[in-house]
Amino acid sequence: MIKIDFAGGVLKNRQELDMRILDILHENAEHLGVSYESTDIPGKLGTLIRKAMAKYGQRAVVLVDEYDKPILDNIDNPPIASEMREGLKNLYSVLKQQDANIQFIFMTGVTKFSKVSLFSGLNQLTDITISRDFST
């Protein structure tokens, strides 16, 4: 499982977001016992997914906790919120690209998918917010 968690702390700019993402990817690589040579975020995530699948013989499961928090933390500053949206799109676009290597993706957040333009590449999202099958 690859876990991407934005729940902790407040990210104030794109540089902080990118650093957090790089830290998260590094932690996942260590946990899964894989390495990568890529230097950019999409390359690192793509390689992490592929190498995890190759090592464990199973397609990856990706958990994204609070997928929209970096945007919502900056909602009162539209230019920064826009930078955060672009940074997250840079990350999430890899998930569509790696579809063949991913079993499923589970995302939590506050905003409805259709209200956030992060997922133009992901066309198979299912909102289970009010589904009885997933209630506790």
Stretches with model-predicted labels:
Residues 1-136:
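Phosphate-binding site recognition
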